[in-house]
Amino acid sequence: MAAPVVDAEYLRQVDRARRHLRALISSKGCAPIMLRLAWHDAGTYDVNTKTGGANGSIRYEEEYTHGSNAGLKIAIDLLEPIKAKSPKITYADLYQLAGVVAVEVTGGPTVEFIPGRRDSSVCPREGRLPDAKKGALHLRDIFYRMGLSDKDIVALSGGHTLGRAHPERSGFEGAWTQEPLKFDNSYFLELLKGESEGLLKLPTDKALLEDPSFRRYVDLYARDEDTFFKDYAESHKKLSELGFTPRSSGPASTKSDLSTGAVLAQSAVGVAVAAAVVIVSYLYEASKKSK
C-alpha cells in the first residue's frame, strides 16, 4: 500500500486521534493491551529481509489469530471508532500512537511519534515474537533479528510494569508489579526481589537477571528511574519505527507540531489523568481482563 501523505490535515487527524486515545485509555484502563498491540505489530520486523514491522498487518485475522496475539482483537476493535473519526490515519500509525499514549497516560516518559507509516496486507509468518518460556539466547535471536540491542531488550522488558498475563492467552497468570496500570521502574525492583507472592516472573524475565549483559541494565534501571525512562523512550521509538523511515524533509511543521507543541499538551494532560487511571484500573482489569 502507498505511504500516506502527511499534510496539515493528516496532522490534525493525528492530534484528534491522540485526544480520543487519551479518553479511551483513561476511561477503560486499557493501556496494557494498547501497548501490547503496538509492540506485537512492530515486533515482527526482520532487518535482513525488510519484512514485518509497524505496518498495521495485525488487524488481519491471519495475524491476530497467531498464538502470541491471543486477546489482541479486543484492542483492534476498541480502536475502530477512533479510526472512523480520523480516517486518513493509517492503521500502522494509529496502533503505534496508541502505544505511545498508553505509556504517557500511565505516568511514563514521552515517546517521540512521527507519522507516515504505510499499511500492509502482508502478514508475517507465526513465530517472530518472543516466547515467554525461553531464555537469553532466544531473546537475542528475536531482538537482534529486529536490529535491536541488549539495552533495548531490557528497557522494553520494563514495559511489563503495565498489565498482567492471562492463562487463556499466554499460559501464565498474574501481574508483574503491584500497580499494573502505573508506568514506573517497579518491574526491575520486583525482579531483583526474587519470587514474590502473587506477582509474575516469566522465564524471559528471569533471563534478564541471569545474563551479565542484561543484568547490568536491570540494576541500573532499578536504582535510577530517570535513566530507565530515557532509555525506554529511545527504545520504544526504535521499536515503533521498525520497517519505517521517518521523513527527513518536508514541511517543518510536521515534526515540530508532533514533537514539541503536541508533546507539551499531551504531557500536561497525561499528568492530570494518571492518578485517575490508577484508581479505575483494577475495576477494569477485573471486568475485562485486558493485558
From Swiss-Prot:
Q: What is its main location?
A: membrane
Pfam name, any one: peroxidase
Q: Where in the cell is it found?
A: Peroxisome membrane
Q: In which tissues has expression of this protein been reported?
A: Expressed in leaves, stems and flowers.
- Chain residues that bind K(+): T161, T177, D184
Q: Which cofactor does it need?
A: heme b
Q: What is this protein called?
A: Probable L-ascorbate peroxidase 4, peroxisomal
Source organism (scientific name): Oryza sativa subsp. japonica
